[in-house]
Amino acid sequence: MAKEELLEMQGVVNDVLPDTRFRVTLENGHELIAYTSGKMKKNHIRILVGDKVTLELSPYDLSKGRITFRHIENRGTPNPQAQRRRY
């Protein structure tokens, strides 16, 4: 299947499931099970409950998806006076 056939949607992570799977609610209210893409696993990108993500869906099975991007929101500015750990 070519990449042009994939549907790209936005959603919010509702629940973290075993084996790097997540229950995600799409913007249209549809709920599905999604897994992280290989590059996200390779780069150790963490996904938490409440994160906004971009998903790829197959037009043949809309109940499963692949998370390809985690949108970063401002979670507060880091404290510049905080001491860093030295290893």
From Swiss-Prot:
Q: Name one Pfam family in it.
A: eIF-1a
Domain called S1-like: residue spans: 1-72
SUPFAM superfamilies xref list: Nucleic acid-binding proteins
The entry lists its GO molecular-function terms as:
ribosome binding; rRNA binding; translation initiation factor activity
Q: Which InterPro entries does the record associate with it?
A: NA-bd_OB-fold (IPR012340), RNA-binding_domain_S1_IF1 (IPR006196), TIF_IF1 (IPR004368)
The keyword rRNA-binding is assigned to this record:
yes
One of the record's GO cellular component terms: cytosol
Localization annotation: Cytoplasm
> Keywords, A to Z?
Cytoplasm, Initiation factor, Protein biosynthesis, RNA-binding, rRNA-binding
The domain of life for this entry's organism is Bacteria
Protein purpose: One of the essential components for the initiation of protein synthesis. Stabilizes the binding of IF-2 and IF-3 on the 30S subunit to which N-formylmethionyl-tRNA(fMet) subsequently binds. Helps modulate mRNA selection, yielding the 30S pre-initiation complex (PIC). Upon addition of the 50S ribosomal subunit IF-1, IF-2 and IF-3 are released leaving the mature 70S translation initiation complex.
In the record, the note on similarity to other proteins reads: Belongs to the IF-1 family.
This protein's assembly is summarised as: Component of the 30S ribosomal translation pre-initiation complex which assembles on the 30S ribosome in the order IF-2 and IF-3, IF-1 and N-formylmethionyl-tRNA(fMet); mRNA recruitment can occur at any time during PIC assembly.
Protein name as catalogued: Translation initiation factor IF-1 2
What is the source species? Dechloromonas aromatica (strain RCB)
Give the lineage: Bacteria, Pseudomonadati, Pseudomonadota, Betaproteobacteria, Rhodocyclales
